[in-house]
A protein has these predicted regions:
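Specific transmembrane helices
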Residues: 1-160, 173-177, 236
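Transmembrane helix-loop-helix hairpins at the membrane interface
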Residues: 26, 145, 149-239
Length: 239
């Protein structure tokens, strides 16, 4: 595949590749001529297929626009962050750091007992005394119902995985070969945030006026960009 790689390279090329990849990712969601909204099962299934294809297309951008000396030092899998060496700390440390950031909601769910719904723990009481817990007995249908819920799968599985893979794993290595690490960390999420403006079209179709739809989209851009910077920082530090 060496003959299909870009020979000349610049920072503009890196940023341009990320921009094009963002456009292609969003465009893949709208290639289907569907009269239904984004939450309709047929629309969700079609978009699942689109992002599945993008999981194969996105690494091609990374390979084609990567500098030759970088690919000589690391494989494409390693650039994507998929490697065995250091994988465990790369998973555990960011997970605990993220848990610290969400310590408030986690504490509230812990005190209220709501976490038992997710863990499937049932208290067994005898004469008013909690004797022991039974695992996976409280609400077994909670996870089963969610795994068959297309909207839940989209919001919690498919969208996060495909977005992180495309906007982090495939874009950040391109920017890191040109920009300083911290610069790349803050530039990369801009593509991620801007990509969410396509939801503005859906909101206007649902009857929301332009000004209101724009305000909501700008707010969404703010928090998705902020989260994207945090995610990009974790990726850069654990790569």
């Amino acid at each position: 595949m060496e003959g299909y790689r870009l020979k000349e390279y610049s920072c503009f090329t890196s940023a341009g590749a990320c921009f094009i990849l963002s456009v292609v990712y969003v465009a893949s969601l709208y290639v289907w001529n569907s009269p239904h909204n984004r939450d309709h099962p047929s629309t969700i299934k079609k978009r699942f297929f689109s992002v599945f294809i993008m999981m194969f297309v996105s690494p091609l951008f990374l390979y084609y626009f990567s500098q030759e000396h970088i690919l000589q030092k690391a494989t494409l899998w390693q650039l994507l962050g998929l490697r065995l060496h250091g994988l465990l700390p790369a998973i555990v440390i960011p997970m605990f750091l993220t848990m610290v950031l969400f310590l408030g909601p986690l504490s509230m769910q812990g005190f209220s007992g709501l976490w038992k719904l997710y863990a499937g723990i049932k208290n067994v009481w005898i004469s008013g005394v909690n004797i022991f817990n039974i695992i996976f007995e409280a609400e077994p249908m909670y996870w089963m119902s969610n795994l068959t819920n297309l909207i839940w799968l989209r919001n919690h599985v498919v969208a996060p995985l495909s977005e992180e893979f495309t906007f982090r794993a495939c874009m950040l290595p391109l920017l890191l070969q040109c920009f300083r690490p911290m610069t790349a960390v803050f530039v990369c999420p801009l593509f991620f945030g801007v990509a969410h403006f396509h939801h503005m079209v859906e909101r206007m179709r649902n009857g929301l006026d332009f000004k209101r739809a724009l305000m909501i989209s700008c707010f969404q851009f703010s928090y998705t960009t902020l989260f994207g910077a945090y995610s990009a920082f974790l990726f850069a530090k654990t790569d």
